[in-house]
Amino acid sequence: MGDKQERGLEFFSKVLGEDNAAGMREHIGSSDFGKECGNWAIDFAFGTVWTREGLDRKMRSCAVLGMLIALRQTDEIKYHVRIALANGLTVQEIEEVLYLSVPYAGFPAANSAKAAMIEVLREVEGEAAG
């Protein structure tokens, strides 16, 4: 395993939890269909881009959420809301990212994102309650 992959898995574990990281380790070490997509995500997205200097993790989360809203990638938004919370964003800050997207990405994209965000925030609230 290379340095980028190690950094990527370490970051992945910090923001999505050790159970998810263990699942990703298993997937990228397997012969499963699409495993290279997982390798690329860990090596490039998490091991190279997310771990760069220049922006803190909160700023990166804001930027990624904004892009995902504009692209209407609601499944990815769900992951990245959890990542944003792990990176220190508050629910109010995530809500402001949503509001900022409206004049640039439009109401339909923002409304789709809002539904995905609410779903995840309710899950997180339920997990915290026990």
Model-flagged regions — what are they?
Residues 105-106, 121:
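A short hydrophobic/aromatic micro-motif that marks alpha-helical segments and, especially, helix-coil
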Residues 41, 45, 62-67, 97-104:
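Short alpha-helical scaffolding segments that buttress acidic/His motifs in well-ordered protein cores
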Residues 1-57, 86, 112-130:
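Acidic, glycine/proline-rich low-complexity segments that act as flexible tails and inter-domain linkers
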Residues 62-95:
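Mid-chain, well-packed structural core segment of small domains
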Residues 22, 55-56, 61, 77, ...:
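A generic structural micro-environment signature
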Residues 107, 111:
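Substrate/cofactor-recognition hotspot
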Residues 33, 55-58, 76, 93, ...:
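Residues at the start of alpha-helices and the adjacent loop-to-helix junctions
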